[in-house]
């Protein structure tokens, strides 16, 4: 089932320097909660400055949903320490609140209890909140409070030049974009390995279902927790953040211009379902527009091609201008065993897997084959640890045992690890391979199995509160290592100044401005 990558691996072993200079970044979301686990109703902590313009700490859907962002970094340890500093400072500046350590929320009785993220009075800030109003009215607020980790990854120019020859200008844009689309196609085919190893949401609180019927065969504990005994990541299931109305868009990952055209079409395609919501009611705007996507960011995807945007530029226009610059991996649950929601083992594994995805042959995929890859993902998400579980290839009927496929993949990853260790020194990547490959013979070692044992003992709420309390105490005590207190104060002040400048620069009323941007 795993493609033959032997020639590409032999090439890599002859060109180890092609991997020198991998760049990466992390984003981590987490809900602010009270000591009893209920959602915090306070505004964004003052010490964190403006959520609209802060470089490192912002908010996602809700005012209580923090998002931490590291700068691009070539050093894993430095990046994780930077992320930890953001958590340390925040833990000391959020009063008696804690950071919820799980992907799935708990103790939220009603969607109405969730305040949307607020970004001030600038047109840009109001637009961001209106977008969230649209998300709430389309999908429900509760679903939007699910948290995850995003891992951003780019290969060095040396890799592309070694692989594609001496490239520059338009030629580089085309070839590098084609290379990243290969990564994406392989990710759709084999990325289920991420929830298998690191999925950490095998259960949900009963309140999350809000009384809605479900066809999933949940088991229920006395304290009202619903779980699937072999599930890995309910966050990635249809209960989590997926968008059924997007499944017919037919967006593919074979060609830059085709992909962008599909995305642009989706933000112009009217939706009968969303038209029923209405655009405005009693003088209050309910969504930006009633199209399938309000804006491009609404496209749900487990992985995205990205380029840093310029001021006023849409994500797709940035891609058209310069091609794909990096990849955003979006399938990581919060790691409940780490105070910062992600750890070194995961980052090193993702490095290995992304390099493998760049090397392995990846035939073009039609939208129907893309839909077929979802079958493997769903199996792993809902019953990944089930004995005897098999996986298929695309829309074909042949089936292969998951443990065997996993071990075959890791045989390749071990060779990538040896190459990365040869240029970085030590054996850190090979150690990660040895630790993780054991999960295929012993699924009890996976994150989902480990966290489910705790949840069955103490419930999701009990587990979440215990981890949140322990991490709060730990982070509040730890000294900053990279950033200093004055760096945070300076960024707070600078972010507030930037927001004020944006508000002062607006010349049009929001309604007029919105007509041009909706």
Swiss-Prot record:
GO MF: ATP binding; glutamate-cysteine ligase activity; metal ion binding
Pfam families registered for this protein in UniProt: Glu_cys_ligase
GO CC terms of this entry: cytosol
Signal sequence, renumbered to the chain: none
Stored InterPro entries: Gln_synth/guanido_kin_cat_dom, Glu_cys_ligase, Glut_cys_ligase
GO biological process, one term: cellular response to arsenic-containing substance
Keywords, ordered alphabetically: ATP-binding, Glutathione biosynthesis, Ligase, Nucleotide-binding
SUPFAM superfamilies, alphabetized: Glutamine synthetase/guanido kinase
Pathway: Sulfur metabolism; glutathione biosynthesis; glutathione from L-cysteine and L-glutamate: step 1/2
Catalytic activity: L-cysteine + L-glutamate + ATP = gamma-L-glutamyl-L-cysteine + ADP + phosphate + H(+)
Lineage: superkingdom: Bacteria
Principal EC category: ligase
Keyword Repressor: no
EC number: 6.3.2.2
Family according to the record: Belongs to the glutamate--cysteine ligase type 1 family. Type 1 subfamily.
Annotated HAMAP family: Glu_cys_ligase
Protein name: Glutamate--cysteine ligase
């Amino acid at each position: 089932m795993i493609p033959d990558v032997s020639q590409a691996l032999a090439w890599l072993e002859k060109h180890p320097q092609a991997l020198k200079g991998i760049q990466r970044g992390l984003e981590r979301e987490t809900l602010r909660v009270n000591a009893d686990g209920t959602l915090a109703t306070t505004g964004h902590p003052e010490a964190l400055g403006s959520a609209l313009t802060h470089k490192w700490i912002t908010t996602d859907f809700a005012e209580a949903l923090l998002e931490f962002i590291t700068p691009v970094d070539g050093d894993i340890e430095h990046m994780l320490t930077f992320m930890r500093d953001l958590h340390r400072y925040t833990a000391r500046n959020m009063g008696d609140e804690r950071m919820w350590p799980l992907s799935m929320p708990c103790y939220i009785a009603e969607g109405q209890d969730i305040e949307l993220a607020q970004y001030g009075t600038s047109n840009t800030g109001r637009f961001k909140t209106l977008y969230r109003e649209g998300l709430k009215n389309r999908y429900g607020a509760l679903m939007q409070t699910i948290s995850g980790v995003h891992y951003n990854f780019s290969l060095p120019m040396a890799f592309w030049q070694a692989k594609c020859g001496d490239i520059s200008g338009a030629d580089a844009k085309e070839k590098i974009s084609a290379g990243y689309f290969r990564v994406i196609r392989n990710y759709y085919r084999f990325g289920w390995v991420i929830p298998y190893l690191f999925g950490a949401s095998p259960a949900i609180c009963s309140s999350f279902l809000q009384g809605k019927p479900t066809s999933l065969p949940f088991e229920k504990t006395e304290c009202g927790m619903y779980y699937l005994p072999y599930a890995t990541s309910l966050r990635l299931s249809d209960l989590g953040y997926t968008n059924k109305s997007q499944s017919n868009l037919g967006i593919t990952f074979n060609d830059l211009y085709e992909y962008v055209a599909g995305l642009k079409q989706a933000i112009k395609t009217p939706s009968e379902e969303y038209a029923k919501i209405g655009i405005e009611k009693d003088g209050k705007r309910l969504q930006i527009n009633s199209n399938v996507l309000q804006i491009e960011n609404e496209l749900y995807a487990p992985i995205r091609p990205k380029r840093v945007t310029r001021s006023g530029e849409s994500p797709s226009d940035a891609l058209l201008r310069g091609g794909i610059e990096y990849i955003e991996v979006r399938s990581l649950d919060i790691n409940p065993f780490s105070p910062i929601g992600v750890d070194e083992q995961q980052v090193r594994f993702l490095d290995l897997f992304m390099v493998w995805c760049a090397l392995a042959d990846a035939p073009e995929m039609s939208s129907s084959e893309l839909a077929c890859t979802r079958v493997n993902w769903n199996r792993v998400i809902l019953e990944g640890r089930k004995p005897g579980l098999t996986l298929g290839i695309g829309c074909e009927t042949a089936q292969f045992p998951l443990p065997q496929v996993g071990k075959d993949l890791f045989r390749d990853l071990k060779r990538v690890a040896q190459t990365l260790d040869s240029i970085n020194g030590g054996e850190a990547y090979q150690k990660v391979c040895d630790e993780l490959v054991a999960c295929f013979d012993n699924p009890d070692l996976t994150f989902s199995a480990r966290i489910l044992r705790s949840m069955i003992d103490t419930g999701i709420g009990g587990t979440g509160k215990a981890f949140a309390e322990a991490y709060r105490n730990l982070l509040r005590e730890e000294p900053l290592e990279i950033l200093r207190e004055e760096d945070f104060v300076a960024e707070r002040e600078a972010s507030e100044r930037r927001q004020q400048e944006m508000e002062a620069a607006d010349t049009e009323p929001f309604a007029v401005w919105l007509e041009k941007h909706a």
